[in-house]
């Protein structure tokens, strides 16, 4: 487990990459230009800030308002958001509270979610808002993953890879720390430092900052994406798939001030039964195979164990040769 109590440096501007160009199509010169920027940013930081104009001001406002309504529901109501999968469904710990929706890019799935919370009538407005937002983030995720696989010369696996994943949309609320705990670093932790276990994560924070990312030289930096952009981040499963060519960065949420923080996350996740294994094209004398093939659910179950929680790198502890 990584240390949470290292003072962060000053705010830092991660690379900003624009995905809004209408000519951004596979095979175009603009695509190749953006693809090179994506690879450089992920090699350097494991993440980057993405501007994507399909996430309009109006859509962002609607998502923010939907989250306020959802988290105002009584706890027993929110606890109806259940899942048999680890780290899915409703979660609550200290300052952190979260709701999870599988396949929120499919409207029927979001309707099922709101029907859990409002059994009599669902909530059409919230369903449509979350569905549209998830759809747009999925479009961005697919572009990023296609660019990554092209960059490493494994484009023959693109369709197989994209079809082997599904999406989890997570709505997150971080409560401000109590007034009498201003000097207590433990109570300021909205979310402990961790690497994400999935393929790609896309995060968007609303109005209140708090996200920090650890660089490869072990420095914590405050990340402050604009309200018009999102943070795209490599997860452990992508690191394993690429035989360690990219790294998944540690990140955490530190809460200061008196405002509640809301954020959203879209997580691309390997489907049940899919084996994560590096293609032969990424294994050679200079890059020997680092990880054993594994199934994502087994990895999550390991992460829930004491050994998984205390490991400096759960991925290496679980799957490294």
Curated annotation (Swiss-Prot):
InterPro entries: DIOX_N, IPNS-like_FE2OG_OXY, IPNS-like_sf, Iron_ascorbate_oxido_reductase, Oxoglu/Fe-dep_dioxygenase_dom. GO terms for molecular function: dioxygenase activity; metal ion binding. Its cofactor is Fe(2+). Gene3D superfamilies: B-lactam Antibiotic, Isopenicillin N Synthase, Chain (2.60.120.330). Binds 1 Fe(2+) ion per subunit. Residues 165-270 form the Fe2OG dioxygenase domain. The keyword Metal-binding applies. 2-oxoglutarate binds at residue 261. Its EC number is 1.14.11.-. Disulfide bonds: none annotated. Fe cation binds at residues 194, 196, 251. The keyword Iron applies. Keywords: Dioxygenase, Iron, Metal-binding, Oxidoreductase. PANTHER family: 2-OXOGLUTARATE (2OG) AND FE(II)-DEPENDENT OXYGENASE SUPERFAMILY PROTEIN-RELATED (PTHR47990). This is Probable 2-oxoglutarate-dependent dioxygenase AOP1.2. It comes from Arabidopsis thaliana. The gene is AOP1.2.
């Amino acid at each position: 487990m990584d240390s949470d109590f290292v003072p962060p440096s000053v705010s830092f501007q991660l690379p900003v990459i624009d995905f809004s160009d209408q000519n951004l199509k596979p095979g175009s010169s603009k695509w190749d230009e953006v693809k090179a920027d994506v690879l450089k940013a992920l090699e350097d930081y494991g993440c980057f800030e993405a501007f994507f104009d399909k996430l309009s001001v109006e859509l962002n406002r609607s998502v923010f308002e939907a989250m306020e309504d959802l988290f105002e529901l009584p706890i027993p109501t929110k606890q109806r958001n259940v899942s048999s999968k680890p780290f899915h469904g409703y979660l609550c710990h200290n300052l952190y509270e979260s709701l999870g929706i599988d396949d929120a890019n499919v409207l029927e799935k979001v309707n099922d979610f709101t029907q859990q919370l409002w059994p009599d009538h669902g909530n059409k407005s919230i369903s449509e808002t979350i569905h549209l937002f998830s759809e747009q983030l999925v479009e961005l995720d697919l572009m990023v993953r296609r660019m990554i696989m092209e960059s490493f010369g494994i484009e023959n696996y693109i369709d197989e890879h994209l079809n082997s994943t599904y999406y989890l949309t997570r709505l997150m609320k971080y409560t401000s720390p109590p007034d009498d705990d201003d000097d207590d670093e433990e109570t300021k932790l909205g979310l402990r430092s961790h690497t994400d276990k999935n393929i790609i994560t896309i995060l968007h924070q609303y109005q209140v900052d708090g996200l920090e990312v650890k660089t490869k030289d072990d420095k914590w930096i405050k990340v402050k994406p604009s309200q018009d952009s999102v943070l795209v981040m490599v997860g452990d499963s992508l690191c394993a798939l690429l035989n360690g060519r990219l790294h998944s960065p540690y990140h955490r949420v530190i809460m200061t001030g008196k405002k509640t923080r809301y954020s959203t996350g879209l997580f691309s996740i390997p489907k049940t039964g899919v084996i994560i294994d590096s293609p032969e094209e990424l294994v050679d004398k200079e890059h020997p195979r680092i990880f054993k093939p594994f199934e994502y659910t087994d990895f999550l179950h390991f992460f829930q164990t004491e050994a998984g929680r205390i490991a400096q790198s759960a991925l290496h502890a679980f799957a490294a040769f």
